[in-house]
A protein has these predicted regions:
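N-terminal targeting leaders characterized by basic, low-complexity, disordered sequences
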Residues: 1-24
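N-terminal hydrophobic targeting segments that direct proteins to the cell envelope
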Residues: 2-3, 27-123
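Extracytoplasmic/secreted envelope proteins and their assembly/folding machinery
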Residues: 76, 125-127, 158, 162, ...
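N-terminal post-signal-peptidase region of extra-cytosolic proteins
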Residues: 82-90, 106-120, 124-129, 163-180, ...
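C-terminal solvent-exposed extensions
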Residues: 86, 228, 289-372
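Extracytoplasmic
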Residues: 96-99, 123-128, 137-140, 145, ...
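Flexible, polar/acidic helix-loop-strand segments at domain edges
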Residues: 97-99, 195, 199-275, 279-281, ...
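Amphipathic, coiled-coil-like alpha-helical scaffolding segments used for oligomerization/assembly
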Residues: 162-222
């Protein structure tokens, strides 16, 4: 089993594919017993995306390198013990392959706020995403995998995909995702939800278009574009009971928040203001851990290549599903659409997401301008 002990690095060193049908119930009715769990998923999802984008779009100077090097925690190499891997992407001479990040939001029950702490059976993942930076560094694609997806977990048979982290930590999770998708994972990130309200406030809040008047964190807001602070954004993503499509509408809200944060980072002057950038990076990096192979040098190389990426170049999607079901042992599960999923996975594996979207125009539903 891969050693996942904590190490400190050297300073040098869109839109979901919403399936038709009823909302996906929480596994074993967990949400009824743990009311705070679902809103954490939103925070973790956004944090993972922002982590990749910020590390890949900042013109990283020496002071940023120092901040990242001293603040980011690392996992020991989770790829070292893997004997079976998805194939490397084939590229033409002179071209660069896409870079794929597996981003997890950990439901940490051991050491709150420390995403590197893992023990067998102690925690599962609340959010699972593959974030791909295209080989030409012009596009970012974010594919979410429902945590209750019923899949083959190597050595454990059929199980929910989020159980892989509980069974075998980062290494087994990578192996499970690669086996399911055929997508070669290059780097691994685990994020926690601590300090996320502060992160939202660091960028001056986020603008969300509300479809209806709402009361968020005790403030009555009209329909239309509204600037939300951290507390209000949190309340916005926690709501579920009053939404007509339940969890699926909540997914829309989560992804709207993701896009709003990214847009605000690019438009608010955060990236050009050293003081604000340092504060923002500190908030992001204090709630995440990466594999030790993701060095600051690689982050800097990624930064140079992604300097022209903007929020319009980021696409959000969810693995196609085929409805919900119950497992033989009574768990509430999500069945994946094998045929539709295979096409999407192939597009990611071959760095052809743009071509996939052009040839399958109805497969990805763009995030609406206004969200419930």
């Amino acid at each position: 089993m891969t050693d996942t002990s904590l190490r400190h690095p050297s300073p040098s060193a869109a839109t979901p594919l919403l399936p038709e049908g009823p909302p996906v119930p929480a596994a074993d009715d967990v949400s009824a017993r743990r009311p705070g769990r679902l809103w954490k998923i939103a925070l973790l999802s956004v944090l993972g995306l922002v982590t990749v984008l910020v590390l890949g779009t900042v013109a990283v100077g020496l002071w940023v390198r120092h901040a990242l090097g001293s603040n980011v925690e690392t996992f020991a190499d989770p790829f070292a013990g893997l004997t079976t891997r998805a194939p490397q992407q084939a590229v033409q001479k002179g071209q660069e392959p896409a870079t794929n990040f597996l981003v997890l939001g950990s439901d940490s029950r051991i050491s709150a706020g420390d995403p590197t702490q893992w023990q067998i059976g102690a925690q599962r993942t609340d959010a699972i995403m593959i974030v791909q930076v295209s080989g030409n560094r012009e596009d970012v694609s974010v594919m979410s995998i429902p945590r209750d997806s019923w899949v083959d977990v190597p050595g454990h048979g059929r199980a929910k995909i989020n159980a892989a982290y509980s069974y075998g930590g980062p290494a087994l999770t990578i192996q499970t995702v690669e086996q399911l998708t055929g997508i070669r994972i290059d780097h691994f990130i685990v994020a926690d939800f601590e300090s996320f309200k502060t992160l939202t406030d660091e960028i001056g809040g986020v603008t969300i278009n509300l479809k209806t008047p709402q009361t968020l964190a005790g403030t009555e807001l009209d329909a239309g574009a509204q600037l939300l602070n951290g507390e209000q954004a949190l309340a916005y993503t926690r709501e579920r009971r009053t939404l007509p499509n339940g969890d699926f509408d909540r997914i829309n809200r989560q992804q709207a928040w993701m896009r709003a944060i990214v847009s605000q980072v690019f438009s608010s002057g955060t990236l050009s203001d050293p003081t604000r950038l340092y504060s923002f990076l500190h908030a992001v990096t204090s709630t995440m851990a990466v594999d030790e192979g993701l060095t600051v040098d690689e982050m800097q190389d990624l930064a140079l290549g992604m300097r022209d990426v903007r929020s319009k170049d980021i696409k959000f999607m969810t693995v196609p599903t085929a409805g919900t079901d119950m497992s033989h042992d009574g768990q509430s599960i999500v069945n994946l659409d094998a045929d539709a999923g295979a096409l999407l996975f192939e597009a990611f594996a071959t760095d052809a997401v743009e071509e996939y979207m052009e040839s399958h125009p109805g497969a990805v539903e763009l995030l609406p301008a206004t969200v419930n």
